[in-house]
Amino acid sequence: MPAESGKRFKPSKYVPVSAAAIFLVGATTLFFAFTCPGLSLYVSPAVPIYNAIMFLFVLANFSMATFMDPGIFPRAEEDEDKEDDFRAPLYKTVEIKGIQVRMKWCATCRFYRPPRCSHCSVCDNCVEEFDHHCPWVNNCIGRRNYRYFFLFLLSLTAHIMGVFGFGLLYVLYHIEELSGVRTADTMAVMCVAGLFFIPVAGLTGFHVVLVARGRTTNEQVTGKFRGGVNPFTNGCCNNVSRVLCSSPAPRYLGRPKKEKTIVIRPPFLRPEVSDGQITVKIMDNGIQGELRRTKSKGSLEITESQSADAEPPPPPKPDLSRYTGLRTHLGLATNEDSSLLAKDSPPTPTMYKYRPGYSSSSTSAAMPHSSSAKLSRGDSLKEPTSIAESSRHPSYRSEPSLEPESFRSPTFGKSFHFDPLSSGSRSSSLKSAQGTGFELGQLQSIRSEGTTSTSYKSLANQTRNGSLSYDSLLTPSDSPDFESVQAGPEPDPPLGYTSPFLSARLAQQREAERHPRLVPTGPTHREPSPVRYDNLSRHIVASLQEREKLLRQSPPLPGREEEPGLGDSGIQSTPGSGHAPRTSSSSDDSKRSPLGKTPLGRPAVPRFGKPDGLRGRGVGSPEPGPTAPYLGRSMSYSSQKAQPGVSETEEVALQPLLTPKDEVQLKTAYSKSNGQPKSLGSASPGPGQPPLSSPTRGGVKKVSGVGGTTYEISV
């Protein structure tokens, strides 16, 4: 009966149990009302006491057999039997006391039934040690309620026998009064008791045999152990004692409980969470705990609102407040950096945007270099279309920034003091400009019009190749793509950019330049160094050409003599500077000599006149032509001999700086001169061709350029 609470109500299944209860209670009531008072007078007053105790015992066992759980197994959940539902065999065999016992798969409850378990078709449940389904008690008889059913049968049989016997005794005492009410009622009760005694007594005897043999009604009816040995029997006495005296079996079904709603009154209200302490509940593998953290609600809300896939914050901007002279250029560098996003330029990692430049200079000059590199990064990344196209060719080579220091902003020179011996980009033309009073306006025009594409080429090639080649450091304009760089629109020049990547040999050479050998010689005049046209724009080249025309018209300075070995000298002195040598960017020209024996350190030679490397074009000067001669590539300068005044010991001391491998690179790297094949620039021209360089006479030197153009330079 406890199993049908959740199912549809069926009145038919309550008819047998209701009839049994009515007959039991009704007959006993009539017996106590009409028969027991006479028996107490004639026989003994203990008769009604006995019948009362027996009736109560019968009624108690009847109630227990009806309302008690017989031992129902709970059904498997849907997620528990997914794997076993369709692939399970019908039977499984287990061994109990050496006997094979089959377990059948229950498709309704979705598990293998244990031994002696069967599925009740009426209750629709699998019952442990299923005996039978009794309609008189409206319940299955199983392991948990079989004891009460068996006692009910025994007590009912005894009660029926007592009612029938004591009623017969009453009739015998009142045989003359058979028509009386008491005698008639006693005869009716005897008929009912006698009617139910036959089946009840037979059922009781059957179960006594089953208990003695250790079997169930289901096993006896189906004949499971009819021809064999019952593995579940323990002997007659043990079987009886197990049924009557053993402890009750556990209950597998939980008792249904209704959910209770508890209303919290004001003394039990939850306190508000304070800012100082927040309780966090943690659910991890079914374990609850409370973790107290000292965080404010505002901080927790911010943490929870942040997405897990949010981008990290940008890196902090550099603090330029402590550097003087940089605030004016901050807006320019920022605008140029933002304009690079829309251009098709080589990808550069963000970490290099504010990377300081490393050089071989002294420690005192590290801070100016780093600050200048921060601002000139955006300038050097501006690339015209021709540079972007030419960078795809395999012949593109990286070059360092070799622009003269005069191109830098004057504020840098005032704010940061550079070591003249450690700075490798100071040109000789700037020093001569200081001696001749070169105007600041022309410097500003050159700075605004000129450009240096090698700075960007070195940066772009760092992304492409990852390193700098030694020959490209020595010959920046040897690449055929250099002409395409100058043909494009010229961006603003970088402000004091210094290449942060220097090769080992270049660092060694600069170390030698920092500590040159000083030869105590007097000030002598020397030939001007060749002009580096590869780092200048078309406007500057045109200005230089105009300056050369002015030099031809002016008379030569007194005391200037031709010295063939001073063309490639890399060290000079300004008037009044004594013997303090200074390195210049034109010292790289000395490395271009085919023999590579020109020493890096030279005696101090004064320089007069306006410089060739910083000759600017005036306001009214005409625009330059489409082609400009590259005097730095003239064979007359590359074929000059070493200065005879330099001792042999100095050459031997500086000879290890250029190894035979470097000499081979120097020879092969200059197969082209001024963008022309080597055959056109040979030392011995064929008949009918003008010589590339003529001997110097009268302080005027003739130099032939591209296309047969001849230039006269006053020396």
Curated annotation (Swiss-Prot):
| Membrane disposition | Multi-pass membrane protein
Which residue stretches are annotated as topological domain Extracellular? 35-38, 170-191
Q: Which residues carry this modification: Phosphoserine?
A: 247, 296, 299, 345, 380, 398, 406, 409, 415, 425, 429, 432, 529, 554, 621, 684, 694
Omega-N-methylarginine modification sites? 617, 697
What enzyme class is recorded for this protein?
transferase
Q: Which GO terms describe its biological process?
A: innate immune response; lipid transport; positive regulation of pyroptotic inflammatory response
Stretches with biased composition (Polar residues): 442-478, 668-677
Reaction catalysed by this chain? L-cysteinyl-[protein] + hexadecanoyl-CoA = S-hexadecanoyl-L-cysteinyl-[protein] + CoA
Cellular component, GO annotation: plasma membrane
Region named Disordered: 289-715
Segment forming the signal sequence: none
The protein's predominant localisation is membrane
Q: State which residue ranges cross the membrane.
A: 14-34, 39-59, 149-169, 192-212
Q: Which GO terms describe its molecular function?
A: protein-cysteine S-palmitoyltransferase activity
Q: What processing steps or modifications follow its translation?
A: Phosphorylation regulates association with endocytic proteins and its subcellular localization. Phosphorylation by LYN during fatty acid uptake leads to inactivation of the activity. Autopalmitoylated. Palmitoylation of the C-terminal tail regulates stimulation-dependent plasma membrane motility.
State the EC number(s): 2.3.1.225
Question: Which PROSITE patterns does the protein's record reference?
Answer: DHHC
Q: What is known of its domains?
A: The DHHC domain is required for palmitoyltransferase activity.
Which PANTHER family has this protein been placed in? ANKYRIN REPEAT AND LEM DOMAIN-CONTAINING PROTEIN 2 (PTHR12349), PALMITOYLTRANSFERASE ZDHHC5 (PTHR12349:SF3)
UniProt record similarity statement = Belongs to the DHHC palmitoyltransferase family. ERF2/ZDHHC9 subfamily.
Q: What is this protein called?
A: Palmitoyltransferase ZDHHC5
Please tell me the species this chain comes from: Pongo abelii (Sumatran orangutan)
Lineage runs: Eukaryota, Metazoa, Chordata, Craniata, Vertebrata
